[in-house]
Each structure stands twice: as structure tokens, then as C-alpha cells.
């Protein structure tokens, strides 16, 4: 245990280096020093703090370091080793998830919707240890239409009627009863109708105001696509055990809809749809999600890339307050330099547009200076040195 005297000494020592280390590093250092089981002396504290300052300063980049190029090659080179497949979600046969290079391209292209949108929904303490309660929430979330709970539907053009046979197993699986299905149908705007039961799971709907086959088949489509319950976009919700708690994995994503459900832990909910995160929780959350998703994709392929390279990509994609792709319609296409834009793609168009607008090239970046053969402002090129020569 750390004595009270050493605790106060740690606080005083950390206060003295506040200008040398970021607040987060100081906070982590404080927790490590105060929670240790070793009996620390003043000398030990000084050595640990000096070592932390030294390590931090050595980890900083040198002035003029080409961080963009280093990040590009550090992510791009491992990216060449990635697979081009869609995998089954671990332990769940029904769900697929895009991994590897296709997923990385989705992220940096800032696609509006991922090819395999998935959510991981954590539950509050009241629900996460009880499988039945978790299933109850999963049923509330899963988007269910009438076509999902029927075994057959037949159209009788003689009597202008539609007969629906409900699937007992599917009703049980979705947590729906026949009476609620009939109640929903009776509330639809179908004109004047009459519902007659054949048995517990079969009933016929007679349309008394329809007199042509085309209208009857339109009613059939309307019935099949009628929502019974759930959140739009969530095609499937599966309860899975993670450690000692139950979580819900979904096929499909609707962050705004799910966070309103009682029992969902809003602080831990996850989705692989970056734009949904930006719209619901803001751009800072989207930045974190971009970094997390890229890191996850690389780690799944057994590739180790320093988090700082990934954070640079996330920062560039979100610096304007909206999520932008890295490409001609995003970061690269919006560079202030005419020559840099022209060097990337559609050269003639960029040059003509810039000439028509009377744009000025200021030669502040890397590409434009290389094009005209000037030293770039990176590395030693960032230093402007004047020497005074003693001329005799």
C-alpha cells in the first residue's frame, strides 16, 4: 500500500510535469502509482516519472516528419495482404459480415450504408443476465411483417377474398399471437372488409368494395408488407452470450430507433454504420468509430498498425464536421491546391475549372512543389536557414 506521505509526494511531482505530459497520460500515471502494491519511496516515484517523461518525448514525431506518407504506407502495405471475402459472424450461421479489404474500402470511402450492417446491443443490468428478458427485447427490435409469420396466402378472385394461414412456429419465435395480426389488419385502410376465422391460425378477409383482380392483388402485396412490430432496418435480432451477460446481435442497423428501447444500454451500443453514429451521437463519436472499425479490420487479419496512423485517417475524414470519404468526392477532391487536385484524378477538368474561376496556386503542399521541381516543406525542407558569411 502507498502511504499518505508518498501519495501527496506523487501529486506534487505530477503537478510539476503538467506542462510536459498530456492530461490523459498524467491521469494514467497517477492511477498506476497510487494503486500499486509496491512500497514506493520518493526516489522510486522520481525515477518512474522521469522515465515516463523520457518515453513520451521519445515517442513524439520529429518536426517536419511526413506523417501523411508514413501513415499511408503503414496502412496501405498491410492492406495488400488482406483477403477479399465475406465471413460468417462468429458463432452465428445466419449472419454474414464483411471483413478484410472490402470493409476497409467501405470505411475510407465513407459509404452511406455498409454492405452488411450489424449492431451489437448491450443491455442494462436488469436485462443482461436473463435470457428470457434479452429475447423479449430482441423480439421488440426485430422488424416483423405479416409475410414473416405466414405459411401460405391464397387469393380467391371469385369471392374477392384473401385467405391467410399463419405459421404457429414463426408466431411463437417472433412473440406474436394470431389476434394481434388480425387486429393490425382491421386497422389498415383496405376499404370495407370482413374477417372470418377458419381455425385458430387461418382466416379469410373479404373485400366488399373491390371488383377487379388488379386491386385484389395490390391488397395482397399491402398485407404481406404490413408491419406487425419492430424497428425498420433490423432484419434479424439474435441473442448471444458474451461472458456472463447476454447481448443482441442484429442483421441490419437503426441506431436512432434502437436507443429508444427500454433495457438497451445506450452507452455501450455499437454499429458498423459510421454515418448513423455521426447523425445520432455527433462527429466526435464518428471519429472514434472510424478508428475503431479500421483497427478491428486490420487486427482480424492479424495485422498490427500503430493507432496513430489510423487516428490520422479518422481526423482527416471528420475535420470539417461531417464524415467525408478519402477520394475525388471528399478529402482529395477538396484540396486547395489546383495542381494537387489535377495530379489525383480527372486532370484536364480540374485545370479548366480552376482557370475559369481564376484560382491561384500557392505551392504550400507536397505534390504541387514536386510537379514544378521545388523543394518540399517536409523534413529538412521545412527549415529556412540563413548564414552570415564573413567576407574579407
Curated annotation (Swiss-Prot):
Record keywords, A-Z: Cytoplasm, DNA-binding, DNA-directed RNA polymerase, Nucleotidyltransferase, Transcription, Transferase
Major site of localization recorded for this protein: cytoplasm
Any Pfam family hit: RNA_pol_Rpb1_5
GO molecular function, one term: DNA-directed RNA polymerase activity
Entry GO terms, CC: cytoplasm; DNA-directed RNA polymerase complex
EC number assigned by the record: 2.7.7.6
UniProt cross-references to Gene3D superfamilies, sorted A to Z: 1.10.150.390
The family this protein is said to belong to: Belongs to the RNA polymerase beta' chain family.
Record-linked PANTHER family: DNA-DIRECTED RNA POLYMERASE, DNA-DIRECTED RNA POLYMERASE III SUBUNIT RPC1
Protein purpose: DNA-dependent RNA polymerase (RNAP) catalyzes the transcription of DNA into RNA using the four ribonucleoside triphosphates as substrates. Forms part of the jaw domain.
Name of the protein described by the UniProt record: DNA-directed RNA polymerase subunit Rpo1C
Species this chain originates from: Sulfurisphaera tokodaii (strain DSM 16993 / JCM 10545 / NBRC 100140 / 7)
Classification lineage: Archaea, Thermoproteota, Thermoprotei, Sulfolobales, Sulfolobaceae
Amino acid at each position: 500500500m502507498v502511504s499518505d506521505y508518498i501519495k501527496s509526494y506523487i501529486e506534487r511531482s505530477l503537478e510539476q510535469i503538467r506542462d510536459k505530459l498530456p492530461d490523459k497520460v498524467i491521469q494514467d500515471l497517477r492511477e498506476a502509482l497510487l494503486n500499486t502494491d509496491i512500497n514506493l519511496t520518493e526516489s522510486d516515484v522520481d525515477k518512474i516519472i522521469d522515465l515516463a517523461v523520457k518515453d513520451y518525448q521519445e515517442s513524439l514525431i520529429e518536426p517536419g516528419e511526413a506523417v501523411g506518407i508514413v501513415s499511408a504506407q503503414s496502412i496501405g502495405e498491410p492492406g495488400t495482404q488482406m483477403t477479399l471475402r465475406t465471413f460468417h459472424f462468429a458463432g452465428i450461421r445466419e449472419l454474414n459480415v464483411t471483413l478484410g479489404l472490402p470493409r476497409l474500402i467501405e470505411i475510407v470511402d465513407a459509404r452511406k450504408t455498409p454492405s452488411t450492417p450489424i449492431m451489437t446491443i448491450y443491455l442494462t443490468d436488469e436485462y443482461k443476465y436473463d435470457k428470457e428478458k434479452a429475447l423479449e427485447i430482441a423480439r421488440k427490435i426485430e422488424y416483423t411483417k405479416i409475410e414473416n409469420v405466414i405459411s401460405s396466402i391464397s387469393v380467391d378472385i371469385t369471392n374477392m377474398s384473401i385467405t391467410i394461414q399463419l405459421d404457429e412456429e414463426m408466431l411463437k419465435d417472433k412473440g406474436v399471437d394470431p389476434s394481434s395480426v388480425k387486429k393490425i389488419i382491421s386497422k389498415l385502410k383496405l376499404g370495407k372488409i370482413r374477417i372470418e376465422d377458419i381455425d385458430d391460425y387461418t382466416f379469410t378477409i373479404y373485400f366488399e368494395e373491390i371488383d377487379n383482380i388488379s386491386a385484389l392483388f395490390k391488397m395482397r402485396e399491402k398485407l404481406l408488407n404490413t408491419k406487425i412490430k419492430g424497428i425498420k432496418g433490423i432484419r434479424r435480432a439474435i441473442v448471444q452470450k458474451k461472458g456472463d451477460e447476454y447481448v443482441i446481435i442484429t442483421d441490419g442497423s437503426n441506431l436512432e430507433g434502437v436507443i429508444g428501447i427500454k433495457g438497451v444500454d445506450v452507452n455501450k451500443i455499437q454499429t458498423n454504420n459510421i454515418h448513423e453514429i455521426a447523425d445520432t451521437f455527433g462527429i466526435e463519436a464518428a471519429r472514434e468509430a472510424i478508428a475503431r472499425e479500421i483497427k478491428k479490420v486490420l487486427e482480424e487479419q492479424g495485422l498490427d498498425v500503430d493507432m496513430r496512423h489510423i487516428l490520422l485517417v479518422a481526423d482527416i475524414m471528420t475535420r470539417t464536421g461531417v464524415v467525408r470519404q478519402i477520394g475525388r468526392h471528399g478529402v482529395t477532391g477538396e484540396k486547395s491546391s489546383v495542381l494537387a487536385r489535377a495530379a489525383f484524378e480527372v486532370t484536364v477538368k480540374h485545370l479548366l475549372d480552376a482557370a475559369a474561376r481564376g484560382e491561384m496556386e500557392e505551392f504550400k503542399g507536397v505534390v504541387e512543389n514536386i510537379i514544378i521541381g521545388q523543394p518540399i516543406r517536409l523534413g529538412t525542407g521545412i527549415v529556412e536557414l540563413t548564414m552570415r558569411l564573413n567576407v574579407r
